[in-house]
Swiss-Prot record:
It catalyses: tRNA(Lys) + L-lysine + ATP = L-lysyl-tRNA(Lys) + AMP + diphosphate. This is Lysine--tRNA ligase. CDD domains: LysRS_core (cd00775), LysRS_N (cd04322). One of its GO terms (molecular function) is ATP binding. Keywords: Aminoacyl-tRNA synthetase, ATP-binding, Cytoplasm, Ligase, Magnesium, Metal-binding, Nucleotide-binding, Protein biosynthesis. PROSITE patterns: AA_TRNA_LIGASE_II (PS50862).
Length: 494
C-alpha cells in the first residue's frame, strides 16, 4: 500500500541528503521548552524591546510562515504553546533563504537565539541559527473540515491541532493520578491482574476470544477485574485496587467503547454502605482537585459533587416515576409495562427482577442528573453479590448515576462458596437458554472462595465516563486517546 506523501516534500528530503544534511537527526539540545520560556518571561514582568534572555535553544512544530523580504516571522508550537520566531537575513546569512526552500508547515525545527518583545508586545525569539529536526511528508490538514471519525482515527494530528482534544487528555490523566493518590491515602495498594484469562468473569458481557498457541487453548480478554482482585482479598490483602483496560465485545456508541478503562477496588471487612461513603468522598476529592470546585457544567446541567449524594432504592425510584408501588404490582402488570415500552429483559427471561431492572433503565436512569446512589437491586441482576441482610429477594448492590449515565457499580461481595456455586450454575442454565451475557462457571474462583474470603465491599468505576463529565464531552470517543474505529477509516487517505 503506497503512502500519500507529498512528492515535493519527499524531494526536499532527497535533496537535503545529497547536500549532506540529515532531515531526521538523532538529537537536539533544548535548553528551554516553549512553555518554560513563557513562564520565565512572564515572571520577569519586563516587556523589553531589547533582547533580555540570550542563547535560548528550543524546538517546535511550524504552524505559520510569514515571509517579508529580508525579515520574516514564523510561529512554532509545542505542547499546546506557541512562540513567534523573528528571522533576519543579516543574522542567518545564506540559511535565511534556505529556510523557505526546505522548511514548511508541520515540520519540526530547533532554533537558537535571543528573547525579546516586538513593538506590538508579542514575545519573540530573534533566531541566530536553526536546524530541521523532522521533515513532515504530509501537509497538515484543515482540521476544522474533517469529520469526527477521521479525527478519532488520526488522533496524533487531532492532539496537535485541536486544543480541546489535548486538554481532555491532560485532564484524563490528572483524574487518574488523583484517584490513585486518594486511594493510597486510604491505605489501598495497587495491584495487577491477568488481561488474558482462561475463564472470563466479573460482569455480564460478551468477551473477545483468542487462542494460546503453546497451550492450544482458547482464552479470553478480561471483561472485568473483579474475580482476580477477590483472589488477592482471599490471599490476605485487605485493601486492593487496579486501574486497567477491560474488553467487552459489544456495542460502540456515545457512552460505550469495547476497550475501556476501569477502576476496581476491594476492601476487606467492609460492606456496600462503607463503599458508598468511600465513593462519595473519592469523587468529591477528585473533582475538587482537578477543577478547583465541587461543581461542574455538563451540557445544560450544573452537577454538584459537594454531597451528600442522594440515596434511594431501585424499587422506590421506579415507584416514584410510575406513581405506583412496584412491589405491589403483579408479574403480568410488569409484562404489560415491558410491552408498552417495547422492552426485552436480559436473555429474554421474563422473571420479575430482570423486568424491574429493565424498566428502571428505561424510565428512571435518564432522570438522574446529580450524583445518585441507586441501592438494593433484585437478586436476579447479578450472581456475585451478597443477598440483602434484611430484604429477601434483593442484593446489597448499588450503582451510581450522574447525568443519566451509570458511572459506578458496587456490592457487598458474595463470599459464600456454596451459594456462589449455585448462582454460577443458574447462570449457565440462562446461557443454555440463549443469554449470551450469562456469567460462565468459574470452578477455580469457587475453589478460591472455599478457602474463605472475609466480608468484603467492592467497587467499579468507569474512568472514561468520569472524564466525559469533567471535560463536558458527550461522546466517550472524545476522552479515549485512541477509540475503536473501523480500520477502513484508519487507512483512509487524508
Amino acid at each position: 500500500m503506497l503512502m500519500n506523501w507529498d512528492e515535493r516534500r519527499v524531494k526536499i528530503v532527497e535533496e537535503l541528503r545529497k547536500n549532506g544534511i540529515e532531515p531526521y537527526p538523532h538529537k537536539y539540545e533544548v535548553t528551554h521548552l516553549i512553555k518554560d520560556i513563557k513562564l520565565i518571561a512572564k515572571s520577569q514582568g519586563n516587556k523589553s524591546h531589547e533582547p533580555f534572555m540570550f542563547n535560548i535553544s528550543t524546538a517546535g512544530r511550524v504552524a505559520n510562515i510569514r515571509r517579508h523580504g529580508k525579515a520574516s516571522f514564523v510561529d512554532i508550537f509545542d505542547e499546546g504553546e506557541k512562540l513567534q520566531l523573528y528571522m533576519r537575513v543579516d543574522e542567518l546569512k545564506e540559511k535565511y533563504d534556505k529556510f523557505f526552500i526546505y522548511v514548511g508547515r508541520g515540520d519540526i525545527i530547533g532554533v537558537k537565539g535571543d528573547l525579546f518583545y516586538t513593538m506590538k508586545g508579542e514575545l519573540s525569539l530573534l533566531v541566530k541559527d536553526y536546524q530541521l529536526l523532522s521533515k513532515a511528508l504530509i501537509e497538515p490538514p484543515d482540521w476544522s473540515k474533517l469529520s469526527p471519525e477521521f479525527r478519532y482515527a488520526h488522533r496524533y494530528v487531532d492532539f496537535l491541532y485541536n486544543d480541546n482534544a489535548r486538554k481532555a487528555m491532560e485532564i484524563r490523566y490528572t483524574i487518574i493520578r488523583e484517584i490513585r493518590e486518594f486511594l493510597y491515602s486510604k491505605g489501598f495498594i495497587e495491584v495487577e491482574t491477568p488481561i488474558v484469562q482462561p475463564v472470563y468473569g466479573g460482569a455480564l458481557a460478551k468477551p473477545f476470544k483468542t487462542h494460546v498457541n503453546y497451550l492450544n487453548e482458547d482464552w479470553y480478554l478480561r471483561i472485568a477485574l473483579e474475580l482476580y482482585l477477590k483472589r488477592y482479598i482471599i490471599g490476605g490483602f485487605n485493601k486492593v485496587f487496579e486501574i486497567g483496560k477491560v474488553f467487552r465485545n459489544e456495542d460502540i456508541d456515545v457512552t460505550h467503547n469495547p476497550e475501556f478503562t476501569l477502576l476496581e477496588l476491594y476492601w476487606a471487612y467492609a460492606d456496600y454502605n462503607d463503599i458508598m461513603n468511600l465513593t462519595e468522598d473519592l469523587l468529591k476529592s477528585v473533582v475538587k482537585k482537578v477543577t478547583n470546585s465541587t461543581k461542574i457544567v455538563y451540557g445544560k446541567y450544573e452537577i454538584d459533587f459537594e454531597g451528600p449524594f442522594k440515596r434511594i432504592s431501585m424499587y422506590d425510584s421506579l415507584s416514584e416515576i410510575l406513581g405506583k408501588d412496584v412491589e405491589s404490582m403483579s408479574d403480568n402488570e410488569l409484562k404489560e409495562l415491558m410491552k408498552k415500552y417495547n422492552l426485552t429483559p436480559r436473555g429474554n427471561q421474563y422473571v420479575r427482577g430482570l423486568m424491574i431492572e429493565k424498566l428502571f433503565d428505561k424510565l428512571v436512569t435518564p432522570t438522574l442528573t446529580n450524583p445518585t446512589f441507586i441501592t438494593d437491586y433484585p437478586i436476579e441482576t447479578t450472581p456475585l453479590c451478597k443477598p440483602h441482610r434484611n430484604k429477601p429477594g434483593l442484593v446489597e448492590r448499588f450503582e451510581m448515576f450522574i447525568a443519566g449515565m451509570e458511572v459506578a457499580n458496587a456490592y457487598t461481595e458474595l463470599n459464600d462458596p456454596i451459594l456462589q456455586d449455585k448462582l454460577f450454575r443458574e447462570e449457565q442454565e440462562m446461557f443454555r437458554r440463549g443469554d449470551e451475557e450469562a456469567h460462565p462457571y468459574d470452578k477455580d474462583f469457587v475453589r478460591a472462595l472455599s478457602y474463605g474470603m472475609p466480608p468484603t465491599g467492592g467497587l467499579g468505576i468507569g474512568i472514561d465516563r468520569i472524564v466525559m463529565l469533567v471535560t463536558n464531552n458527550y461522546s466517550i470517543k472524545e476522552v479515549i486517546p485512541f477509540p475503536m474505529i473501523s480500520s477502513k477509516v484508519i487507512l483512509e487517505d487524508d
